[in-house]
Amino acid sequence: MSPTADFDPKPRRASVAVDVGGVIVGGGAPVVVQSMTNTDTADIDSTVAQVAALHRAGSELVRITVDRDESAAAVPKIRERLLRLGMDVPLIGDFHYVGHKLLADHPDCAAALAKYRINPGNVGFKDKKDKQFAEIIEMAIRYDKPVRVGVNWGSLDQDLLTALMDENARAGSPLSARQVTREAIVQSALLSAALAEEIGLPRNRIILSAKVSQVQDLIAVNSMLAERSNHALHLGLTEAGMGTKGIVASSAAMGFVLQHGIGDTIRVSLTPEPNGDRTREVQVAQEILQVMGFRQFIPVVAACPGCGRTTSTVFQELAQNIQNDIRKNMPVWREKYPGVEALNVAVMGCIVNGPGESKHADIGISLPGTGETPAAPVFIDGKKALTLRGPNIAADFEALVVDYIEKRFGQRTAAE
């Protein structure tokens, strides 16, 4: 039998650390969660509100679109408003086509942003491409800002792709078009990074990303980048889609890559429902990292799926209530109860796995299943502490969870 260590996550790939407005990406630092607004950046009120919501949800970096003069002019005002709210969240400027001009024409914007995102596929075309790319890099050097060279297969450098396709056609054993496209994505990122360094931007100011919309392609291009460079890597499945499909696709793709030690910051690109909550993408990113054991953001609530033994909905409602209460209270608890994000709660529906799972949790309850005695044993720190009975079992257990948090994690604050 193979040692169990063989199945543990691979050691994190060694990468160069990049400081993004005080948040370290790469260099062995915890994998950073980031997100992006979908507001018109020129609408300062809406953008500030959404950045604040994303940051409160746990986004450590927030990207905003900078697509025209009005957007660029709004950036320093957005930054100032956020600071007045007590939110020193690094803002990343997302530039396409005219980034070189916007940064030059709006120096306050260039200074206010914590990082610039450049797309090699549309930074410029033909003879203007390298010149306009260089202008952005020179601005990054002037303002001491990092950049992300963000390649996306939807806007891939067509000159590079054509050259590689022509070269492949002449090969004795040509690759598939999909394989050549992957190679073009990787080369675009690496060639752009090399050019940035040649211009004078140090490696500890460069992050790379290769965005695709298919799971296997994301695994391939990021594995290739990891083999060929030590740049910090940003992971994300672009156009992942809506709802369950987007969550599953992003989780499958990034989970595999992260398990192999690759990735320094992640963004889950979910298409929100009309008027939906943008913070959902932050929650999913956190949950990917937490369920894989890489970071802890929020207490875990383990709950059984239910079966014929659990015809009552009490355990489902209780699990949902506790999860909702945790999310609602975490902004306060995170400050008031250091370490609370490591808490494990179990809400189980019958005697089969209920007691065992509850013992594994910090605090757990095994509710009675169909035909079982109407009593619910509660386990605290692996031992049976008491048994709840009567019509208020759910409310009583919720109170016990809060009491446990106050006693266990509140003591840390007092001791400090």
UniProtKB/Swiss-Prot annotation:
Signal peptide: none
Cofactor(s) essential for the protein: [4Fe-4S] cluster
Cofactor note: Binds 1 [4Fe-4S] cluster.
Reactions catalysed, as given in the entry: (2E)-4-hydroxy-3-methylbut-2-enyl diphosphate + oxidized [flavodoxin] + H2O + 2 H(+) = 2-C-methyl-D-erythritol 2,4-cyclic diphosphate + reduced [flavodoxin]
Keywords: 4Fe-4S, Iron, Iron-sulfur, Isoprene biosynthesis, Metal-binding, Oxidoreductase
Binding site for [4Fe-4S] cluster: C304, C307, C350, E357
EC numbers, comma separated: 1.17.7.3
Pfam families: GcpE
SUPFAM superfamilies for the chain: Nitrite and sulphite reductase 4Fe-4S domain-like (SSF56014)
Broad class of enzyme this protein falls into: oxidoreductase
A GO MF label: 4-hydroxy-3-methylbut-2-enyl-diphosphate synthase activity (flavodoxin)
Family: Belongs to the IspG family.
Function: Converts 2C-methyl-D-erythritol 2,4-cyclodiphosphate (ME-2,4cPP) into 1-hydroxy-2-methyl-2-(E)-butenyl 4-diphosphate.
Record protein name field: 4-hydroxy-3-methylbut-2-en-1-yl diphosphate synthase (flavodoxin)
